[in-house]
Design a protein with these regions (language model features):
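Oxidizing extracytosolic/periplasmic lumen-facing domains
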Residues: 2-114
């Protein structure tokens, strides 16, 4: 019984929280046209990151965001060639700053089936 309680209440690690956020935005998100601004590669705490910096506009407000796509190998392999290209961005209509350029089931880069 105690083990079941632990599993239910254990803290999710940051990678799992980010995965859940991506899937949530994918489920309820609206699509807007965007542009890939840059790719920033780095390493923190022993893990590599691949940040795709992108911009998009919602209701006259321009947003610039970054998403680490290192957990999405198919996307991470292709983004180095996409700076300056247009892309689709999914954003949360209640919080337009909460957005994704790709997730496990969708890509605004045309690399996965929509």
């Amino acid at each position: 019984m105690a083990y079941a309680w632990f599993l239910r209440w254990r803290r999710k690690d940051p990678a799992e929280l980010e995965r859940l956020r991506r899937l949530d935005v994918n489920t309820r998100g609206r699509i807007s046209a965007g542009r890939i601004v840059d790719l920033v590669e780095g390493e923190t705490a022993g893990s590599k990151s691949r940040l795709v910096v992108y911009s998009y506009e919602v209701a006259g407000v321009t947003y610039e965001a970054a998403q680490d796509v290192a957990a999405l190998p198919e996307i991470a392999a292709m983004v180095q060639f996409l700076a300056g290209q247009t892309a689709s961005v999914k954003y949360d209509p209640k919080q337009p700053a909460n957005s994704i350029i790709a997730c496990e089931h969708w890509s605004g880069l045309g690399l996965l089936s929509h």
